Every structure is written in C-alpha cells, then in structure tokens.
C-alpha cells in the first residue's frame, strides 16, 4: 500500500494529476523494490492507474484486478486543466458534505462509524483539494489502453458491488465488453462501491 501524490501522507507537488503520473510512481516503487512482475489491484480510480501501468510497462504485470473501477467511463477532455484558487476554496467549503457522503460508498455505512473521521484526516493535508480537482480535470477515456492490454493477453479480473452507486456498471458495461471481452468477472452481493 502506498500513498500517491496528493493523497494521504505523500508529497503533493503542484503537478497535473494524470493517470501517467500515478502509474509512474507505482512503476518507480516496483523498480526500487526489485519487483520484476506482479499481480496489480486497483480500487475505484486505482483501476485507471493499473491500466496505465500495463500500458507503460506491460512486462511488469502478471495480471490485473479491477475492483469497482471508474476507468471504463468515457470522458470529454477538458481544455483548461489548470486548478484555480476559487475552485479549491469552493471544494474546501464542501469538505464536511464530502466526508459524510463517503459512508454511502458502503452497502451498510453504519457499520463503519469511524470512516467519516478517517476521511476528514485526509482532507487536512495541504493540497488535497487541488489534487482531487486536478485528477478530475485530467480524466481521459482509456479505451485504447484497454484494447492494448487485451491484445497483450494480460489476464484481467473485474469485481463489482451489486449496490455500487458511485461506479454504476450498467452505464459502461457495453464499453467494457468491447475492450475486455476475455475478462473474468465477479459481482459481490451486499456490496456498495467499497467492498468491505
């Protein structure tokens, strides 16, 4: 487990928060630790990151496990990817709502009474709002990356919560079938976005 730029206790350089930036961090960590090949798991936005890892350095990837991955949506590219102070200020004003809303990612959020406090801790780190906004502005459609992964015959496994209201399977299932027709797929009963 590692904290990526702009998340948790990591550094938060003022860089565009792209899939490539975060994938490169993981690749550097693997190289630093002497990991030659690994099974890689990505939860939610982490699915985008593992796709990019396989795109950049497919030889490092044994197989890919996508858990409630947000990487299968189509995105219109944003022209102005700069993050402005007014956007940061507006997001910070919404922090209390954001933290409370996190429990809705679970099937039974009341079973995780400390989750709000834990998320509020993330929000205290300098640059957190800027990183989230930059991430959103830098989202791109990954269809070509996924088709490349499929063509390389990298085994792909997808896992979905039956009650996920964040990443809604029916909104992208046709696209997913086109890019990963050979995947192994699993649905988790009594699970929301976070499959705890």
Q: Which residues make up each language-model segment?
A:
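Active-site loop/oxyanion-hole signature of alpha/beta-hydrolase fold enzymes
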Residues: 4-41
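Active-site acidic short loop of glycosyltransferases
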Residues: 31-40, 58-59, 153-154, 181-182
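Catalytic nucleophile loop
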Residues: 42, 46-47
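Flexible "cap/lid" loop of the alpha/beta hydrolase fold
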Residues: 48-56, 62-94
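Conserved alpha/beta-hydrolase catalytic His-Asp/Glu region
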Residues: 75-81, 92-151
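Short beta-strand/loop motif that positions the catalytic acidic residue
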Residues: 152, 158-160, 164
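Conserved alpha/beta-hydrolase "acid-adjacent" motif
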Residues: 165-171
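Catalytic histidine-centered segment of alpha/beta-hydrolase-like enzymes
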Residues: 191-196
